[in-house]
Amino acid sequence: MKDDVLKRQAHTAIQKKLGYAFRDMSLLRRALTHRSHHAKHNERFEFVGDSILNYTVARMLFDAFPKLTEGELSRLRASLVNEGVLAEMAAEMNVGDGLYLGAGELKSGGFRRPSILADAMEAMFAAVSFDADFNTAEKVVRHLFAERVRRADFQNQAKDGKTALQEALQARRFALPKYRIEEQIGHANDSMFVISCDLGELGFVCRAKGTSRKAAEQEAAKEALKWLEEKLPLKKKKK
């Protein structure tokens, strides 16, 4: 009973942060339900929410940076639409307080896990579109990302590890790296991935861990890039 009251309070606070009040609260509850808690979880909602998020931020950047190329816009969007940013946003909104998690996930601190928080954010964008329409969901995303887009600075924006490594290899005329899952530790809801990054003819292979495959690949790419730049630095062009 007490838990129900606390959940309702959390959901009220989350709606205020979203800037949207649900007519059908079951949609919000579904968006906040992890697969460890119930068969009717939020993963299908994530699929829709991810598309809404990517389109909206892409359009915001398109309008805000008219001189950037397609590749530059893509990299800037990747710096804004990722697990880290979404998890940070969810933490600011105290989304973890409103999550429905299975006993094991709850015990292991799932309400703080970045991947779970990020997924819940995407699922909520979908829930808004189902409760209202696409335009309303777009307004919610714009409301949440307005300040981040305003502060976005392409010139000082670090590229993600995989993109930076790819461009560094291409600049040196080497083949693209190959990533492979070497190990998956833990259960489905609490996995740790070990990924290898193989630079092929350069004879360098490194490994990195992450709570998701994407995160581990990024870490492995950063390690490989560090090695590449130390071993084969590019000569600076004379002015």
UniProtKB/Swiss-Prot annotation:
Q: Which cofactor does it need?
A: Mg(2+)
Q: Which residues form the active site?
A: D50, E122
InterPro entries given for it? dsRBD_dom, RNase_III, RNase_III_dom, RNase_III_sf
The UniProt record lists the RNase III domain at 11-133
**UniProt GO BP:** mRNA processing; regulation of gene expression; rRNA processing; tRNA processing
| Predominant localisation class | cytoplasm
Any single GO molecular-function term of the entry would be: rRNA binding
EC numbers for this chain: 3.1.26.3
Q: Catalytic activity annotated for this protein?
A: Endonucleolytic cleavage to 5'-phosphomonoester
Give the function comment from the record: Digests double-stranded RNA. Involved in the processing of primary rRNA transcript to yield the immediate precursors to the large and small rRNAs (23S and 16S). Processes some mRNAs, and tRNAs when they are encoded in the rRNA operon. Processes pre-crRNA and tracrRNA of type II CRISPR loci if present in the organism.
The name on file for this protein is Ribonuclease 3
